[in-house]
């Protein structure tokens, strides 16, 4: 599907808003009676190799869209009406087994016009699951299901456990989007199967998962295995997911990609998030809540072992960054700020939003982690994307194999022995009480962990900030213990060039007297105001 990102995400982001909350109708559907889903056609042999061949064959044929014209009542549903349509517990897949997991399906309608074929895999045999209007409770939608086509199909699905039938822990809905939660039980950012031409000059392509194959788990399995067939105008692909439900939910993913066309910018393991306003960027801070974001930074563990933290921003114009690397060890969008007082939102609980960490399972070679930041006026628009972009552009006839793990939870599964950044604050520079003679911008960066807690208690110790910037000049640079956080605060002003409003790239870390780093590397991009708007 080809379209402009903002138009597409107006629909998909809004549709994700309430997912992950307890199903208010779930208890009404919880009965001892289970109604098995109807199957279509004959079962057929299935494994991942078969699916890869299916994707390869798709890529060798012209693409055709699977979007369908829905009945008018489904097209005209409001969000509240659509959200009231719930899958009945007595129709849940595997509800009639001893499996730890169950599957419930999403209805087509509102923004979701592309039916996704669903298959169950049992003992290496796959059989398609039939859509049944009777499997849904239509709530306050105004629909009763009787007038809907019998072959309408499904929009997606969600996973829950037998012990908690009202709350799902993972959901796949819309294009190749999916989400999961950790111990906090709160949805936040999304992942995608693939990103195509994100942040490029033309329209972005949103590949679709056109079929899912759900493997029936055994009674004692703590992992559910599923497969996805992906298709788009420029590429097809086969995916294998192994999802382990735990406090930090883990997805082991293998993907095989088959380009139809040469692709300008291919995004592997894309993470999609939202950042409107935070401690470091209050440009869109007209809301009564102090901070509004799903995540507050991009975290990188590079192939050469460097740990990098890049705070997110809500820029005035689209901003695109490349972090060149060779065989990256991991990257992800994190929500480090876990303090409710910093958000004050008791409805969506931003402090509980999960981090998403990407861990390659084998060497990915040369390429870059790419970060796209898009201006947004409100929290309903996902404006942050991060993904891996291979150095070589994919071409038709290739098979591209990528294996990786996704971790969803309050913290990533890896950490360094170095101190890490917990806050970045910005504001007008200069010395309080003294007249300012020129414009400057203040940065206050807080680090905790590592050796800093011990060093903060010692008076005769030298901790040196190492600061670099691409233009302008730094002044009033300091690094001092901050006992309230058992760490250090680095403060400095940036004085931009008088005749330039060009972006300034800033790089900072702390080191000891032996020149050894004490902290991860902090990166930032700041665009000074034009000369006429520099108020001091």
Swiss-Prot record:
<dbReference type="GO" id="GO:0030246">
    <property type="term" value="F:carbohydrate binding"/>
</dbReference>
<comment type="pathway">
    <text>Glycan metabolism; osmoregulated periplasmic glucan (OPG) biosynthesis.</text>
</comment>
<dbReference type="InterPro" id="IPR014756">
    <property type="entry name" value="Ig_E-set"/>
</dbReference>
<dbReference type="InterPro" id="IPR013783">
    <property type="entry name" value="Ig-like_fold"/>
</dbReference>
<feature type="signal peptide" description="Tat-type signal">
    <location>
        <begin position="1"/>
        <end position="30"/>
    </location>
</feature>
<dbReference type="Pfam" id="PF04349">
    <property type="entry name" value="MdoG"/>
</dbReference>
<dbReference type="InterPro" id="IPR023724">
    <property type="entry name" value="Glucan_biosyn_MdoD"/>
</dbReference>
<dbReference type="InterPro" id="IPR014718">
    <property type="entry name" value="GH-type_carb-bd"/>
</dbReference>
<dbReference type="GO" id="GO:0051274">
    <property type="term" value="P:beta-glucan biosynthetic process"/>
</dbReference>
<keyword id="KW-0732">Signal</keyword>
<dbReference type="InterPro" id="IPR006311">
    <property type="entry name" value="TAT_signal"/>
</dbReference>
<dbReference type="GO" id="GO:0003824">
    <property type="term" value="F:catalytic activity"/>
</dbReference>
<dbReference type="InterPro" id="IPR011013">
    <property type="entry name" value="Gal_mutarotase_sf_dom"/>
</dbReference>
<comment type="similarity">
    <text>Belongs to the OpgD/OpgG family.</text>
</comment>
<dbReference type="InterPro" id="IPR014438">
    <property type="entry name" value="Glucan_biosyn_MdoG/MdoD"/>
</dbReference>
<comment type="function">
    <text>Probably involved in the control of the structural glucose backbone of osmoregulated periplasmic glucans (OPGs).</text>
</comment>
<protein>
    <recommendedName>
        <fullName>Glucans biosynthesis protein D</fullName>
    </recommendedName>
</protein>
<dbReference type="InterPro" id="IPR007444">
    <property type="entry name" value="Glucan_biosyn_MdoG_C"/>
</dbReference>
<dbReference type="GO" id="GO:0030288">
    <property type="term" value="C:outer membrane-bounded periplasmic space"/>
</dbReference>
<keyword id="KW-0574">Periplasm</keyword>
């Amino acid at each position: 599907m080809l379209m402009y990102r903002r138009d597409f995400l107006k629909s998909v982001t809004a549709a994700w808003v309430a997912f992950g909350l307890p199903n208010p109708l779930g208890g009404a559907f919880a009965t001892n009676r289970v109604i098995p889903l109807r199957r279509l056609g004959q079962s057929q042999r299935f494994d991942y190799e078969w699916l890869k061949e299916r994707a390869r064959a798709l890529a060798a044929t012209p693409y055709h869209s699977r979007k369908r014209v829905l009945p008018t009542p489904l097209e005209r549903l409001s969000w509240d009406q659509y959200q009231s349509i719930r899958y009945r517990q007595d129709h849940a897949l595997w509800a009639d087994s001893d499996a730890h997991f169950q599957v419930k399906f999403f209805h087509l309608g509102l923004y979701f016009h592309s039916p996704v074929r669903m298959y169950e895999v049992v003992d290496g045999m796959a059989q398609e699951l039939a859509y049944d209007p009777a499997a849904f409770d239509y709530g306050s939608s105004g629909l009763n299901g009787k007038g809907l086509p019998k072959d309408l199909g499904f929009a997606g699905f969600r996973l829950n456990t037998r012990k908690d039938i009202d709350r799902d822990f993972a959901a796949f809905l819309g294009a190749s989007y999916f989400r999961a939660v950790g111990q906090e039980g709160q949805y936040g950012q999304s992942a995608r199967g693939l990103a195509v031409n994100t942040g490029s000059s033309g329209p972005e392509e949103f590949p679709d998962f056109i079929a899912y194959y759900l493997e029936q788990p055994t009674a004692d399995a703590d992992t559910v295995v599923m497969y996805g067939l992906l298709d788009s105008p420029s590429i097809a692909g086969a995916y294998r997911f192994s999802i382990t439900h735990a406090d930090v939910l883990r997805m082991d993913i293998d993907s095989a990609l088959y380009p139809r066309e040469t692709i300008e910018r291919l995004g592997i393991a894309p993470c999609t998030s939202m950042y409107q306003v935070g401690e470091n960027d209050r440009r869109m801070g007209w809301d009564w809540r102090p901070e509004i974001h799903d995540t507050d930074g991009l975290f990188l563990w590079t192939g050469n072992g460097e740990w990098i933290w890049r705070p997110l921003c809500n820029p005035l114009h689209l901003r695109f960054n490349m972090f060149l690397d060779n065989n990256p060890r991991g990257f992800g969008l994190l929500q480090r700020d876990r303090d409710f007082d910093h958000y004050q939102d008791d409805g969506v609980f931003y402090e509980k939003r999960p981090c998403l960490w990407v861990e390659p399972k084998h060497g990915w070679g040369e390429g870059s982690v790419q970060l796209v930041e898009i201006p947004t006026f409100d929290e309903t628009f996902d404006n942050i994307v991060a993904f891996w972009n291979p150095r070589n552009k994919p071409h038709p006839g290739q098979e591209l194999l990528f294996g990786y793990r996704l971790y969803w939870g309050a913290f990533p599964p890896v950490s360094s022995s170095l101190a890490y950044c917990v806050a970045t604050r910005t504001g007008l520079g200069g010395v309080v009480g003294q007249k300012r003679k020129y414009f400057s911008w203040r940065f206050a960066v807080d680090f905790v962990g590592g050796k800093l807690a011990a060093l903060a208690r010692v008076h005769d110790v030298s901790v040196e900030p190492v600061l670099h910037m691409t233009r302008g000049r730094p002044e009033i640079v300091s690094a001092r213990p901050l006992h309230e956080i058992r760490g250090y605060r680095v403060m400095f002003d940036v004085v931009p060039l008088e005749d330039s409003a060009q972006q300034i790239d800033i790089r900072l870390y702390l080191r000891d007297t032996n020149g050894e780093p004490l902290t991860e590397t902090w990166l930032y991009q700041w665009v000074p105001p034009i000369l006429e708007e520099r108020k001091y």
